[in-house]
Amino acid sequence: QLEDQKQQINELIKKTGNTTTNITYQQNNVNNNFKLLGYRNTDISHLSDKDFISCISHSNFCIPHLIKKIHFDPDKPENHNIYISNIKNNYAMTYDGDKWNLTNRDDIINDILEEKEIIIEEKLEEWLEKGKKYPEIMKKFTRYLEKKEHDVVLDKIKDEIKLVLFNNRNLIKN
């Protein structure tokens, strides 16, 4: 019986022959090089009409949504140039093109609110000049401008901006 087993083992070895296993390891390195833009030089060329319509459709929160699309788009890391690192203190971080600066949080929120409103207004004017008519969208933005005159609404908008700047801080690569 032992002889039979030896013979079976030898036959199996002959059938399988020399089996060589080649294991290949491949490592792909992808380097994405980009230059972080200064907060005042943020690039908005990637925004489409659809992006603007989407933001304005959020009525009172159109500005926080626009901030997300501009400053926290994973595909536009060069615009990751502003954030709030600690919700409890009164500062925000802004990049000026060379270095990060601690900035008064309320000042930067007022700044960013006004700046993004101007961007939307310019887009609406551009649409009118080109003959594109989005009456519902224009009406929504006009309503937003009227509602934001009330301090309660304005405070909610500013709070939402603060949350956007804080909640997306992890996208920023210092």
Which residues are covered by each model-predicted region?
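Extended amphipathic coiled-coil helices
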Residues: 7-10, 14-174
